[in-house]
Amino acid sequence: VNIVKYASMNVLISMPTLGSLKASNHSRIDAWPQIWNLRTIRLEATTGGQIRIRLKAEDIQAEARTSGILEIKGEAQNLQAILKTAARLEARELETQNADIQLSIGAKAEIQVNQRLTYDLYGHSRLVIKGNPQIENSHNYSGSRIIKEK
């Protein structure tokens, strides 16, 4: 569905499966309370767009930029996320085994990781980690912060 007119509206869509979701220009996609069982999904939120989803997935590719917000709950084997320019990833309630996170220019990610984590942080970004993953091949530059929660 491609809605291009700028108006406040609710659109209800029913579909058997998802491959990707994209929200932009302050739009919001709520894909719950349903739990989506997926092998792979791509999520993209830009320019204030917001996506909320609950899922069980093997692979999640997430991208947010320019104040985009991704809120993900459920379970995933692998999470790959790229966040730029004040984007946010709220995934404390996404139980993830492996994660690869790239943050820059004030982006913030809150994640739960159990096994392996790699990250690259630039430009005053912040990563909040829940869990006790093995951290591999990671970089922290330009005033970025890492916070470990118990």
Region spans (language model):
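Extended, compositionally simple hydrophobic/Ser/Thr-rich segments
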Residues: 3, 9-13, 18-150
